């Protein structure tokens, strides 16, 4: 009897093998699965081969066969690298916390993330202390809190990771600025406790912030234009009596500095209530007293 057919059952499909007279072997070209084999038993796909002769007798071997089973196990590697994403801080952020909790997520929906390959670098220096890796669907959510406060200024964090099939994601970076110091704010006008009879008053001053320029300024809640050198001025209208002027400078990180001034507007002229000369009349060369009662 002769072999009639040879079939290969793999990944739910059956493939007919063709006899190659030059080698004396049966062969077929089979497409690899679209998913990697990492989630399979032993991280490999199994299969079976069925040989049938002209009489209808058949022999089947599969991955459990003692002789050829290992040869029927196929490892399939994925080609897609993991996805990396920062959740905090965001790119270009200005933050006031010098020890921010840096959070990011690494995912791979095929062979999976190899947690040993997750790397985080702060300003180019690899983090060697432990950081949190929490397993989630398709990957890990990670967080790291610097053990030492970051200096005020710009910082860059980068992350790296690979999947179990060795695909390495391109490093992902995020740059942000730490600002723990509020802006400077000085008022050149008005002086505190000023008393004036003018209803129009110019509020002027200067502000600056080394880390988080530009600084915005409000006078009694109204926005004021700040010049490139940090100077500003705004004319306001006083009400009769006591006026409180509140000037607030805010930097890009949200830090604020507030200066207040008390100004009194008095538009009423003094009123004379009484004027007397004593004695009156007075002798030549003598002295007399003038007495005035006046209110305001």
PLM regions and their residue ranges:
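Short, surface-exposed loop motifs enriched in S/T, G, D/E and P with embedded aromatic residues
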Residues: 12-21, 32, 127-133, 222-228
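Aromatic sugar-binding surface patches on proteins
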Residues: 21-34, 136-144, 228-232
